Regions:
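Extreme N-terminal segment that seeds HTH/winged-HTH DNA-binding domains in transcriptional regulators
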Residues: 1-29
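Phosphate-bearing ligand-interacting subdomains
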Residues: 21-24, 129-204
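Glycine-rich Rossmann-fold phosphate-binding loop(s) that bind the pyrophosphate
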Residues: 91
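Hydrophobic/small residue at the entry helix of a nucleotide-binding pocket
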Residues: 94
Length: 205
């Protein structure tokens, strides 16, 4: 795995993969071009070609990209060829929605367990899962060898929960808590804060 590729480039690869999957599902063509992908995604064709060039040559001049092949290659680059088990921490409204979301499986992820510290939620069925007490978090994470977790909890408990997850072996975290998390080197953190996204857009209004 190359470590000198800008994170912003890595961040665009899942967008390309998603659009290639849509093209395949439409079933109208076997090949596409950087121009077509750019038009569909609002990204310049030059940017797409530059991004892909970090990982090799995937297309042919005059022919473009074979959709199936490029999809397979991007899946391999993103390590999505096998399914990743994911732990969800927080069984509130957001955790409930995540547990019922069917879009994870199609894209390489399976919600394997969900935790909460509320005794009224523990034991509740969410989708195909039973909410587990957070006191069992380390034991279950280690037993299932889970490397990916989603935090759907309030900000004041996000850091201590992050510490517990990392100590249990989690290497990648998606946090919905509106707070910066401190993690050791080698642990990836991404944030999803809709308020931040709205505030960014209001600058242009």
């Amino acid at each position: 795995m190359a470590t000198d590729i800008p994170d912003i480039v890595i961040g665009r690869l899942p967008i390309y993969l998603r659009e290639l999957t849509r093209l395949a599902q439409e079933g109208k063509q076997k090949t596409t071009s950087s121009h077509e992908l750019g038009h569909r995604l609002g990204i310049s064709s030059a940017q797409i070609r530059k991004d892909l060039s970090h990982f090799g040559e995937f297309g042919k001049q005059g022919t473009g990209y074979h959709i199936g092949y490029l999809t397979e290659q991007l899946s391999d680059i993103l390590r999505l060829s096998s399914e990743w088990d994911v732990a969800v921490v927080g069984a509130g409204f957001l955790g409930h929605a995540l547990a019922h979301y069917n879009g994870f499986l199609d894209r390489g992820f399976r919600i394997a367990c969900i935790f909460d510290n509320d005794p009224h939620k523990v034991g509740e069925k969410m989708g195909e899962l039973i909410v587990q007490p957070d006191t069992d978090l380390e034991k279950i994470i280690k037993h299932k060898q889970i490397k990916v977790a989603i935090l759907a909890i309030p900000p004041h408990v996000a850091q201590p929960m992050t510490d517990r997850l990392v100590n249990a072996g989690v290497k990648a975290l998606l946090s919905y808590a509106p707070i910066h998390l401190t993690v050791p080197e080698g642990v990836q953190v991404s944030y999803s804060d809709p308020v931040i996204q709205l505030q960014r857009m209001t600058y242009y209004l």
